[in-house]
Amino acid sequence: AHRNWCELVRIAADSGVRFATLHGRTRAQLYVGPAVHPDVSDAPIPIIANGDIATAQDAQNMENLGYAGVMVGRAILGRPWVLGQIAGRNCVPKNVGEIVLKHLQYAIEYYGASVAVPMFRKHAAWYSSGLPNSSEFRIRVNQITDADALHDAISEFWGCGSQNIGL
């Protein structure tokens, strides 16, 4: 991204493009190593930064480098409130477990339990990432096929939502 962005943005602007998104990693890097975000203050069109933007401070750093905005990707997996924090709102959840349970409820309402339960395993893993005993929790969740059992596992892990969802 940092190798030829300036020339590509100039060509795009000359062709009528009104803004562009710049990812801070090259294709060869994949997800390895930190994203590199060049200063784009002199770009002829607004540039949106993408890659390794996980906090409000990361977004502020991009603004300081001349970016018109940010595009958040993997950082919101298991932490959807990050978007509010980047927007300047104090939205740290009091109980992540309640958010996970609400997310599970919405998934079941939308997809039905037979689809939602296996699909939700990855979400439970993202929400629990980095927490004590999360490895054991993920192993347990990946064996669950029943909505109430999944609800109970989430409730137990986060210490919330003692009532099952009745499915």
Regions found by a protein language model. Give the residues of each.
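Short, intrinsically disordered, charge-balanced linker/junction segments flanking boundaries
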Residues: 37-40
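Alpha/beta catalytic cores of nucleotide-metabolism and tRNA/nucleoside-modifying enzymes
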Residues: 4-19, 42-49, 53-167
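Short, solvent-exposed loop/turn segments at secondary-structure boundaries
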Residues: 2-3, 31-35
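Glycine-rich, proline-tolerant flexible connector loops at the mouths of alpha/beta enzymes
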Residues: 22-32
